[in-house]
Amino acid sequence: MAGTVEDVRDENYKEFTDSPGAVVAYGLATCEPCKTYDPILEETAAKFPGIKVGKAKMHVPGRCREIKKTHTFETYPATHFFANGKPLLTRESVVEPAELVALTSDHLIK
């Protein structure tokens, strides 16, 4: 069963990343690897119900202006791990399912 991947945008970014554990994937509609990442994010959300998993759609006009001002992305998708508002880890490109589960477990589960 897949979990819920939340929509992350400027309006909810701080609240989302301030949670005890959050994974944010940044992507573009034109990015083929970003599309293949969606089911992996859903599986991760299902395995970790206490962790917020979200996706920031960087291509949608006006949704992520502030996020773009504070973050630089070399490639998409990019995945950031947060705990209580603090960035813990960044991964570029698609993170394979087993690695995403391991990183989430190792860095966000107390």
Regions found by a protein language model. Give the residues of each.
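Short active-site neighborhood of thiol/selenol oxidoreductases, capturing the structured segment around
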Residues: 17-29
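N-terminal "domain-start" segment that seeds a small globular fold
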Residues: 1-15
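Non-catalytic, surface beta->alpha helical segment in thiol-disulfide oxidoreductase systems
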Residues: 74-110
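Thiol-based oxidoreductase modules, predominantly thioredoxin-like and allied folds used
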Residues: 5-9, 26-28, 38, 42-65
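Short cysteine clusters
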Residues: 31-34
